[in-house]
Amino acid sequence: MLFFQRFKYVSHHYDKKLQYPVKIKKPDPRTAQIIMSQIGGADGELTASLRYLNQRYAMPTDEIKGLLTDIGTEELAHLEIVSAIVYQLTRDMKPEDLQKYGFDKYFVDHTAGIYPANASGIPFTASYFQVKGDAFADLTEDMAAEQKARATYDNILRLVDDPDVIDPIRYLRQREIVHFQRFGEAMRMVQDRLDARNFYTCNPSFDKKCGDSCPNRCSHK
């Protein structure tokens, strides 16, 4: 049974609490700088949310549009979690720790504010993601994006030792795996609507009625 059949979503419902609790007791600007990539990096939560929430419009069925809406919205919740982690790791910094842990360059521009950049300080850019308007191309990118996000969280877990940080990072990592599986289900849904002899004879997001508008005269089910 597919994910969206198992769970009923309510659109535009917002709880004034994090999806997963973040309660960090001690500041650590070095760790904050590492985790920053999941705010504004190429494989981070901001990139993921914008990717899915923009790709959804061209998806061929309401079910798949709904799935991308749900996952894109959840990625915004994950962005809140990561931002809370970074903020709590830096809110009680001592001035001498800034240079000691290499956080001084970020501090000059943003103090302890949250700015979308990666661990190297490169600002977020929309060029990190693509919206192709083709269900196969976009869902393939989505599956790869979730694996890259999972790998990034794996790398973070290799570098941090604070249990208060490890706990929410593990949660986020697990959600990336779930999202990967859901996008795989969406891919199979697209395939089920097409001629199994060749899925790629038309663009299922654009060629609504395969016929004169379809360059290869394929057949939708």
Regions found by a protein language model. Give the residues of each.
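Non-heme di-metal
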Residues: 2-221
